[in-house]
UniProtKB/Swiss-Prot annotation:
Organism: Thermofilum pendens (strain DSM 2475 / Hrk 5)
Coiled coil feature spans: none
Stretch forming the signal peptide: none
Family assignment from sequence similarity: Belongs to the FAU-1 family.
Keywords linked to the UniProt accession: Endonuclease, Hydrolase, Nuclease, RNA-binding, rRNA processing
Recorded GO MF terms: mRNA 3'-UTR AU-rich region binding; RNA endonuclease activity, producing 5'-phosphomonoesters
InterPro entries for this protein: DUF402, FomD-like_sf, Ntdp-like, RNA-bd_FAU-1
rRNA processing keyword on record: yes
Example GO BP: rRNA processing
Phylogenetic lineage: Archaea, Thermoproteota, Thermoprotei, Thermofilales, Thermofilaceae
Gene field: fau-1
Protein name: Probable ribonuclease FAU-1
Length: 491
């Protein structure tokens, strides 16, 4: 039923096994770690790492995805869950509004909601057509013209090419399946063979192609939507962000099923294959001696990696909960134990976010202070002459390495605290933060701690805003939050 992949697979498989779930397409390594896992043939849901290993993506059958995602949030305090029921390959009726560029149009996909859709044929503004989701989002999914129909073995996609799942690696079988698609697919439709096809008989695969083809023909003949909305359900998707504080809870969970080094998942996030193999080897030696090592060694690894960044350009991944966001680059000006100072020089004019009319001018310098496991990034905006223009404090889930040791990352929680040089401090963007709480993305108790933290930062900004401000904000974090990562700030 559930396929599990990635650095979180042992912890998640053990948890889901206790909850009564069954598994499919398991690796031999995972079965060796947890031999009691119950296995069946069909894959309904896949759980895999996000690109930077800071969480997991849960994708597949709607009912199962929802159960898995919210079980993870219930068991792992600090995890952030963004659930989209109408995920990949959901087919919508959309009303074309205006052309954006080339064959890309702005369209209404649900009453009052807009997104962009890529067309495959000429159409006119105001026309209602059918299109399917190719990139899910709770706000504005990216759509592509054509109907998509998903079965357990194959998927039919209008105007698409035939394809085979990357999990089917047998070249002879791939060729056999593609040949089958060319002889049995309806005209104008592409067949995608899902991973379950490799364990099914050709007769069963042919039968499902036929059944979906008949469904496709019926939809094209009988469905003539006049208004935007869902036409054919697709897969659901949940993005479960596991910030550094929640990652330590994952370590504790994993240790119930297999010997686990302290800070195991944070070490794995560094993307260092040699270090990853060393972690695996050490854990094999730890059987029967789970308390042999402390977290001190892992912390020293993190500090060593952070220190090595001094004087270099690094990327900072500013993520939103649903996976969107942006990347900014900066020079690492200094590193002192856990704290890092990042420097950028402004090259183009504009206005600073979070302020009313505060000008951003070429030559301005932005110094950003943060620290490993920091729940804030403190930005000082100064003119080319060194005059302070303002301070912007971004409140976020804990900062950590993102996918490799040259990239830092955090999840933006929406709420920020600002103070222009001659004004009083204020909390901004609170509506975005409260929306996360309302949607169930952020646990209410944890949300309360973040609001207290924001108010504490605001209070600190009412006082002197000198270079010791980041250190005082770090102390506020330690006094408000009680996760293991917050305790590590004393290291």
């Amino acid at each position: 039923m559930i396929r599990v992949r990635g650095i979180h697979s042992t912890a998640i498989a053990g948890l889901l096994d206790e909850a009564g779930f069954r598994f499919a397409d398991l690796s031999q390594e995972l079965l060796a770690r947890i031999p009691q896992l119950r296995v069946e043939e069909r894959v309904l849901v896949t759980v895999k790492d996000t690109d930077d290993r800071s969480g997991v993506v849960v994708l597949g059958d709607r009912a199962v995805v929802e159960k898995v995602a919210y079980l993870l949030r219930a068991v792992i305090p600090g995890a952030l869950v963004s659930y989209v029921g109408e995920g990949p390959y959901t087919t919508y009726a959309v009303r074309l509004l205006s052309r954006v560029e080339g064959d890309v149009y702005e369209a209404e996909y649900s009453p009052g909601k807009r997104t962009t859709v890529k067309l495959r044929r000429p159409h006119v503004e105001g026309e209602v057509i059918m299109a399917h989701v190719i990139r899910a989002s709770p706000e504005a999914p990216l759509l592509k013209e054509g109907v998509a129909i998903t079965g357990s073995l194959v998927r039919l996609v209008q105007f698409d090419r035939h394809s085979v799942s990357e999990h089917i690696r047998d070249e002879n079988l791939r060729l056999q399946l593609l040949t089958l698609a060319m002889t049995s697919a309806p005209t104008g439709w592409g067949v995608h063979f899902r991973s379950a096809s490799k364990r099914a008989s050709i007769v069963d695969v042919m039968a499902e192609i036929k059944a979906l083809s008949e469904k496709a023909e019926k939809i094209l003949k009988e469905v003539a939507p006049k208004e935007p909305g869902v036409v054919v359900p697709g897969e659901a998707i949940a993005i479960v962000e596991i910030p550094a504080d929640a990652s330590i809870r994952m370590d504790a969970l994993r240790s119930r099923y297999y010997p686990t080094l302290p800070l195991h998942h944070l070490l794995k996030r560094l993307g260092d294959d040699e270090l990853s193999r060393a972690v695996d080897f050490s854990e094999r030696l730890l059987a029967g001696c789970e308390k042999c090592l402390s977290s001190t060694g892992a912390i020293e690894v993190f500090l060593e990696r952070l220190s090595s960044l001094k004087g270099r350009q690094v990327s900072v991944l500013h993520r939103k909960v649903a996976g969107a966001g942006h990347v900014w680059s900066a020079e690492v000006e200094s590193v002192k134990r856990m704290t890092v100072v990042l420097k950028r020089v402004v090259s183009s004019p504009g206005l600073y976010d979070g302020f009313e009319g505060l000008k951003r001018e070429p030559g301005d310098v932005i110094r950003s202070y943060t620290w490993l496991f920091g729940r804030a990034v403190v930005h000082f905006y100064t003119s080319a002459r060194g005059e302070l223009k303002g301070v912007y404090v971004n409140i976020n889930a804990p900062v950590f390495f993102a996918g490799n040791a040259n990239t830092l990352g955090y999840v933006d929680l929406g709420v920020d605290v600002t103070r222009a040089a001659d004004e009083e401090p204020k909390v901004v963007d609170l509506a975005e933060f409260l929306d996360l709480v309302e949607r169930g993305v952020l646990d209410k108790q944890l949300a309360g701690s973040y609001l207290e933290f924001a108010e504490s930062v605001k209070h600190l900004l009412e006082k002197d805003i000198g270079e010791d401000l980041p250190a005082r904000i770090m102390q506020a974090q330690k006094s408000i939050f009680s996760f293991e990562t917050d305790k590590l700030l004393a290291v």
